[in-house]
Amino acid sequence: MITSSVDTTTESPKKGRRIRYSGSYPKDFKDRYKEMRGDIDTINKVLAKGSTPAGTHVPIMLGEVLDHLGLNFTREGTRKMKNCLAVDCTLGFGGHSTEIIKVLTTLKNWKHYGIDQDAVEIVKTKERVISAITTANPDTDTNLVTRRISFHNQNFGETEELAKTEGFLGRVDAIMADLGYSSMQIDDPKRGFTFKAQGPLDMRMDPTSGETAFEYLSRVDRKELVRILEENSDEVMSLQIAECLKEEPIPTTTTELSERVRKTVKFTALRNANEIPTKEALDSAVARTMQAIRIEVNGEFRVLEKLLDALPRLLSPGGRVVFLTFHSGIEQLTR
């Protein structure tokens, strides 16, 4: 008798080899920031190191913001409130607004206005904020929440005009603004805010209107470019950088701008001090250059001055304001 047997065991699929890169680290944006793919283990590793994963947003100084706005009701000495009207002038990812609204929902009457000029991101943030509020408290009346949260796609320099239209002039109890670009803007190379990946030289916070960074560089003269590099970013090599950026053809991408600035700073440092700048020094020079141009493209000082001028007319008696900024010039303005 001949018998036969069938092997029913199955081979485990072979594990793919780790992707190799030509250098020590991946150069491509999507490979370098793997956490943007949503892998929870990778995200947790980034968080464990004390960093913020690309593609996410952790609202900075949240406790301090609530304290200074007088909205930390668990803290002894915080003002007693039954009603509150709050305005977030820079909605962004919605992190600060979400936590502020969670506090507001404990009050009898409240209203929250979220303002952002980014027409692309405000739609996503609206869904994100409402979802976060209703998820945090399943008993929340969703219809009530959506009626009491108002989203507005506009520049915060127009907050007074919004207050007149909506009827809250002189009634704002809490205003906050987290100044500068948002995490979503820098995470998307196509917006032109980062030099870590190639993208168009855009830098507009509202991508639907206004001139791009490329258009600004094309029309501005060298003298004016030197001025904005000095005033907006305290750039010590403003003259050399302005000259290199005005050479034809004008750079059209973030990486082209970055390479020009790096070569110029390296050459100037070698000529003047006979030393080669570190990578960190070159990165900082590029970041300062892009910051100076971004501030000008978006009129950041001008719109802030307009908001500051409107504050006495916006705030209720005892109303409070919080500004978050990492820019010394903007800090001086707000003080």
For each predicted feature, which ranges?
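S-adenosyl-L-methionine-dependent methyltransferase catalytic core, i.e., the SAM/SAH-binding region
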Residues: M1-R335
